[in-house]
């Protein structure tokens, strides 16, 4: 499932390449025919992400909400979209543009030489401005958004007896952390024991964690990668991090901790695998 940084990259791509343009919308699969008809011919005015949700605003105060979930993906074709989502195959003959979408495409958006195909999303729906606003109220704080309020997130964390490792996965508290990478890594970097109850978390520790998380997510938006290690803890300390050096504990069960050398632990938590170091994470 894509983390928040990936959805922000998608929103940025739509904002840069589609905003201000009239869009032809269709549903080759047929499952979103009514929704596509509502969008067809409108101008895409804005694209924004909030956690794992992407909202695209069209002329007439009509909004499209997309949540990719586990299997959803966007495929793109057009200049300026390299490295964002997956690329559709460009037809050899210009007369064949846009290329045939295939039967699995829930929604196709075409504007000039740009094509975006959506397939397999968990959610894809058209909302009014009021419905979009009501939906966003239910979402937690997204560290990548300017309107994020870490104090509001802390109030929810500090009122709970649940473990931090569970609370950080809740999208109504912190929007955008959803798999076992950012959760595991930000807790490790803060040296926090993942079973520690939220009510035991001090405010200054939370603010340091929030700042670190925001920086890691911003790096992910910029590079398209999740890299949480410092150069001094990598085998190659100059240049981009190798794939095997990108994380401290995530997906490294049984391997030596990069800081203390003890084995990284793995256990189920919140329906996902939690990775952590019992030696380093004692706070």
What does each model-identified segment do?
Residues 1-283:
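Structured catalytic/nucleic-acid-binding cores of DNA maintenance enzymes
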């Amino acid at each position: 499932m894509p983390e928040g940084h990936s959805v922000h990259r998608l929103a940025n791509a739509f904002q840069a390449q589609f905003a201000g343009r009239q869009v032809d919308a269709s549903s080759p699969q047929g499952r979103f025919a009514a929704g596509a008809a509502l969008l067809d011919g409108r101008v895409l005015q804005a694209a924004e992400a909030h956690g794992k949700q992407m909202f695209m605003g069209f002329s007439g105060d009509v909004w499209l909400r997309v949540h990719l979930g586990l299997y959803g993906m966007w495929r793109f074709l057009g200049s300026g979209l390299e490295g964002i989502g997956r690329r559709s195959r460009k037809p050899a003959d210009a007369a064949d543009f846009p290329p045939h979408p295939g039967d699995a495409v829930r929604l196709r958006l075409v504007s000039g030489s740009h094509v975006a195909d959506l397939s397999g999303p968990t959610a894809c729906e058209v909302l009014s401005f009021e419905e979009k606003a009501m939906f966003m109220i239910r979402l937690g704080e997204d560290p990548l958004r300017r309107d994020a309020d870490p104090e509001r997130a802390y109030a929810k964390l500090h009122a709970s007896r649940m473990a931090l490792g569970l609370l950080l996965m809740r999208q109504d508290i912190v929007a955008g952390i959803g798999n076992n990478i950012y959760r595991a890594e930000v807790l490790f970097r803060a040296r926090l024991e993942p079973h520690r109850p939220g009510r035991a978390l001090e405010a200054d520790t939370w603010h340091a964690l929030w700042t670190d998380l925001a920086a890691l997510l911003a790096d992910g938006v910029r590079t398209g990668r999740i890299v949480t290690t410092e150069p001094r803890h990598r085998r190659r300390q100059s240049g981009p991090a190798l794939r095997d050096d990108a994380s401290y504990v995530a997906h490294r069960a049984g391997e030596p901790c990069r800081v203390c050398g003890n084995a990284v632990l793995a256990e189920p938590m919140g329906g996902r695998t939690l990775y952590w170091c019992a030696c380093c994470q004692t706070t």
